[in-house]
Swiss-Prot record:
Lineage summary: Archaea, Thermoproteota, Thermoprotei, Sulfolobales, Sulfolobaceae
Family the entry assigns: Belongs to the bacterial solute-binding protein 1 family. WtpA subfamily.
A family per Pfam: SBP_bac_11
Domain of life: Archaea
UniProt KW keywords: Signal
Name of the protein this chain belongs to: Uncharacterized solute-binding protein SSO1031
Length: 402
């Protein structure tokens, strides 16, 4: 150690003979210098080998902080893994409803739900083509064929749990059109009297004097419904010429085509688009105005009208397939794609949705109670069979019966 190494030098300086020109004073000075060096060495050695309390506290604090940060990251990762979040693909018009349900579900279970909205047919195409399966739950609207379009991921079953109806949506800007008063007066008289003349005038003005948003029927059922409504109106009010108003729309340069009706909200609110065909619930959720359609044109849940709806059809093309889709009521379906991950949480979410249908009337949809189970295979999962046995579901038949 340092102090032991210097000890002989101190002793040597004390007993050094006073010769060779050294005086006693010089000897004392040397001794003092050596002693100071020894003391400094001792203090330095002690500080190096015995850190002060303040240094220890600081070091301890830094270590503790680092440990907490590491624990937080680990905990966060664990929570994400254990919470088993799910992704829900939903028809774009029902984003508001599903975001509401997702928040309620997460509050009740602490399981996060990621909601993705788009046209039902487009979402089905994604489920069919992407690997791994991109959605844990699929909620298409209107046509059960959207479930069949998931290809090898088609689960063979779907539950209809909400009903809606078509309408013609507009904003306050639309009422400033020079043709608005004429259109609205004919609409009012048509709804009151069901006179063919007023209905003809209404649809003629709608299809020729206004800008219209009609979603691509190959990606969004709302576009498909729009053309079916025009077919029915043509048959009823234009001398049974089923294509009359369809041709007028296709000749109108102010018809805007988009992948989803969701694309029309901003133009409607900005006044750059006059009308679009959509669901009542969508108009309400977006704070837009709408013209209600009579039961025979609305595709609502009217049992006496279902045969009438089915007499009209429109061809669409999805994934290279041409499909003829017949009219049927606007139902919102829920299912789990085949080979989807995290299916236990997906079943839990379905049970939650079916248990909270009554809360959704605020969105102007009609809960179907009990919900209707459709299938095209005998392989109905046990959790769904349990819901059927408990009475929460009612068997409604094969896909072909929708």
């Amino acid at each position: 150690m340092l102090e032991k190494n210097l000890l002989p030098e101190i002793l040597l300086a004390i007993h050094m003979p006073l010769n060779k020109g050294l005086t006693r004073v010089k000897a004392i000075v040397i001794i003092i210098v050596v002693i100071i060096a020894v003391i400094a060495g001792v203090v330095g050695y002690y500080l190096i080998n015995h850190p002060s309390n303040s240094v220890t506290t600081s070091s301890s604090s830094t270590t503790t902080s680092s440990s907490l940060s590491s624990t937080s990251i680990s905990s966060s990762t664990t929570n994400i893994t254990s919470s088993q979040g799910i992704t829900v693909f939903v028809a774009g018009a029902y984003l508001a409803i599903l975001n509401y349900l997702a928040d309620q579900f997460q509050n009740a279970t602490e399981i996060p739900v990621h909601v993705v909205g788009s046209g039902s047919f487009a979402l089905a195409s994604q489920i069919a083509s992407q690997t791994p399966v991109p959605a844990n739950v699929f909620i298409p609207v209107a046509y059960i064929q959207a479930v069949e379009l998931t290809g090898s991921r088609n689960p063979g079953w779907a539950i209809a749990f909400l009903s809606d109806q078509m309408t013609i949506v507009y904003s306050n800007y639309t009422t400033k059109s020079p043709y608005w008063s004429q259109l609205y007066s004919n609409y009012t008289m048509a709804m009151e009297t069901n006179n063919t003349k007023y209905w003809y005038n209404f649809f003629y003005l709608l299809t020729t004097r206004f800008s219209l948003g009609i979603a691509n029927p190959n990606t969004d059922p709302e576009g498909l419904y729009a053309y079916l409504i025009l077919q029915m109106a043509s048959y009823l009010y234009a001398n049974h010429n089923i294509s009359y108003f369809v041709h007028l729309v296709k000749a109108n340069p102010n018809v805007k085509v988009a992948p989803s009706t969701a694309n029309y909200v901003a133009p409607l609110k900005a006044g750059t688009l006059d009308f679009t065909f959509s669901y009542v619930s969508y108009a309400v959720s977006q704070g837009l105005e709408y013209l209600k359609l009579p039961p025979w044109l609305s595709f609502g849940y009217y049992p006496n009208e279902t045969t009438w709806y089915s007499q009209f059809a429109y061809n669409i093309s999805v994934n290279g397939q041409t499909l003829t889709i017949h009219g049927n009521p606007v139902y919102l379906y829920i299912t789990i794609p085949l080979n989807a991950s995290n299916i236990q949480t997906a079943y839990q979410f379905i049970g939650f949705v079916l248990g909270h249908e009554s809360q959704l009337t605020r969105f102007n949809v009609i809960p179907i109670q009990p919900a209707l189970l459709y299938n095209e295979t005998s392989n109905i999962p046990q959790p769904i069979l349990n819901l059927l046995k408990s009475g929460e579901l009612k068997y409604a038949g094969n896909f072909s019966e929708v």
